[in-house]
Structure formats: C-alpha cells, structure tokens
Amino acid sequence: MGKRSDAAAPEPNLSRAEDLVLRMLSIPGGSGREGRVAEFIRQQLRRAGAPASSLRMDHSHKRIPQGGEVGNLILSLPGTESGPRRLLVAHIDPVPLCRGARPVVRGRFVVPASKSTALGGDDRAGATAILVAALEILKRGLPHPPLTFVWTVQEELGLLGARHLQIGLLGKPRLAFNFDGASPEDVTIGATGGYRMQVRISGIASHAGVSPERGVSAISIASLAIAQLHTEGWHGAVVKDGRSGTSNVGIIRGGEATNVVTPEVQVHAEARSHDPAFRAQIVGAIEAAFRKAARSVCNVEGACGKVEIRGRLDYEAFKLPEDHPCVLAAEAAVRAVGGEPQRAITSGGLDANWLTAKGVPTVSLGAGASGAHTTGERLNLAQFRQACRIALLLATAAEDK
C-alpha cells in the first residue's frame, strides 16, 4: 500500500501490553492442552469488540493423530481500507519444561520465578504481540486492510497446528508475518526442513544372570547404531562434501529391570537440512546404522534383533526471495520503529514452513524471547515492546509511513 499522509503511524499501549504478556505467560497449557489460553485470547478479543462471527476455531486438532483440546484460533476482520489481506500468526503452546512456570519481572527482563522451569516466552510473547495489535485496532477503530490473525496450536510437536491448518479459512492473505523468536530485527526469510523418525528395536528377553547368551539386547542394538552414527559423522552437526545438516537421537525408552536382557527399545530421532536431498541422505544413514546393528546382535541360537522404522516429513525447507512484498514490508516496519533489519535463515522449524508450503509466503520476526526450551529462558521487555509496535504497524499497513 502507499503511504498515508493523513494520519500518524499508530502506537500501541505498551504498559497494557506488558501486563497482558505477564497474564499470557501465567496461563498453563502445553501442546495439545491450549484450551485455556485460547479461551483467554477469545475473551480479550470479544471484550474489545470483535464480533462473534469473526472468530472461529478450526478442526486441526481433529486431524492431528494424538488429538488435542482445541484447534487453531482464527480472527478475520474485513478491511476498512483497500489492500491485500494480511496475516499475523504466532503459536500458543510452550514446551513441557514450562509446566508450572510463573513469570516475574527482574529489571529489563521477565524470567521464570523458579530455576527449574522455562518461561514460555516461546511463543506466548509472539502470541501476545499479535493480540496487542488486534486489540488496539478493535478498541481504537484504527484503519486497516483486510486482516487475519491466527494463534496456532502444537507447534512444539512438529508444527502440527500449522501443518493441519484449514488454509481456506484464512481469506487468501497475500502478506504473512509470523512472530516467533528473539530479536524483532531478525527478519527470517527461510528455514530448514525436518524429518522425524521412530525406531522400534525388537530383541529377545532372557534372564540376564542365568542365561544372558539366550537374549538379544535391544539396548545393545541402539548403542551400536548411535555409536556408528557418531563415529561416522552422521550425528549432531553433519557436514559431508560441502553439504550440511543436523541429526539427533533425542528420546530412548526401554527396559524394566536390570536382570532382564531388554527385549524392546523405542528410539526417536530427527534429521534436518536446507537441502532436501542431503536430508534424505542423513535419514538413510540413520536407517542403515540401526539395521546393521540389529543384524549384528544375535544370541547363541542365531536369532538376531529386528528394527521397524517409521518416519515423516515434519516440514519442508523454504527461502523467500529477498524482494518478496512481505519481506520488504517487514523490513520497513523494523526501520519504522528505529531498528535495523537483519535478514536471516534459521536451522529451526517455524509455522512459516507450513504456511509457505500451503501457498502463503511468510516471514518471521522475533518477539523478545531468548534461551528458549531452557531454564535460562527470558523475555527482553524492550524487544517485546518493539515487536508489539512492529505487529501493529504491519496490521495497519503503516510500516511505510
């Protein structure tokens, strides 16, 4: 849109925004249990004047295999000005480490009161930033183009809310902005692709003291496979022939007693790369290592272990053109609040991966949360305020004023 010379660029009520983010951080509800925070957001929007007809919950949770309390919350507003529809999005589920978190303000930061929990700024801060934009528009009657706001669920389980988002409910947005990350000045225009795997290792149980030779240890199989991946450079940061990616064995479950040769182990792993072909090569190396290990662990009767491997693409890699309209709009908004935009490519997955794959090119900006997924997580209030200002500028198409 062109510049509007008849009105100043809008400024949000930042004191109210800080109060709101503290309330959002205090609401329990991890992945699949977002009902309370979704209802809180809905109530805030209704009290600000959003018509009931403008709010809906999609059925994404019914499409997700493990289910969930609610789907993605969607607010659709017709424009008071002409222009392409804009989408603002953020996820509302924190990681399990945030369970029991209580936010406290210490100086310039919001931190968890306990040293044993994370904070949940990832991504309650982003969810609050776009909520602030919606509330300011509703309460103040600010002019704006057609708008859609989405608060997604189950992002932390592999972008499941965005993956199963009913894209037809968004009103065909042309510009999309995802608030998730640390610095609001980081304009993320691309992200890696990720593949998730589950390996079921079947051995043979036996008494570990009386007849260990009759058993086939599933733990031994897992150990050999992981050791091979580590030794051959296929675990952790993976660099081969100028191509790069990552892999990780993140979950191992199995065993019930020390006097039993373990008959079954479940292993969960992932592989990531911006290069789909190289990511497939990493996946192949992981599969080969587990199959080889299973064949090599046998009992005295010649019976060996077995593996069953299942996997799925979590999200595909993407990179937007640097001159894409949503990239330029995001950078203009950062400059409008006195920042210096920095284009970035991330090795993490974002809701933007699936939105872009579904035909809605999306850039991502931070909302002030750093140290995500750790007990050292904190929310930089200055950056959060900046994110709120940027979100409102983008929602009102005033970033180029």
Regions picked out by a protein language model, each given a short descriptive name:
Residues 61-63, 92-94, 150-158, 181-183, ...:
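Acidic, glycine-rich active-site loops and adjacent beta-strand->loop/helix elements
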Residues 44, 61, 65-151, 386:
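Active-site metal-coordination/substrate-binding segment of hydrolases
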Residues 105-117, 202-206, 337-338, 369-373:
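Glycine/charged-rich beta-loop-alpha catalytic/anionic-binding loops adjacent to active sites
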Residues 26, 62-63, 111-121, 206-212, ...:
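A short glycine/serine-rich beta->alpha loop
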Residues 2-71, 268, 383:
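N-terminal helical capping/dimerization or prosegment-like subdomains
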Residues 93-109, 188-201, 332, 363:
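Acidic-glycine-rich active-site phosphate/pyrophosphate-binding loop
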Residues 1-9, 21, 219-401:
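Metal-dependent amide/peptide-bond hydrolase catalytic core
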Residues 115-194, 238-240, 246-249, 258-259, ...:
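Acidic/histidine-rich catalytic neighborhood of metal-dependent amide-processing enzymes
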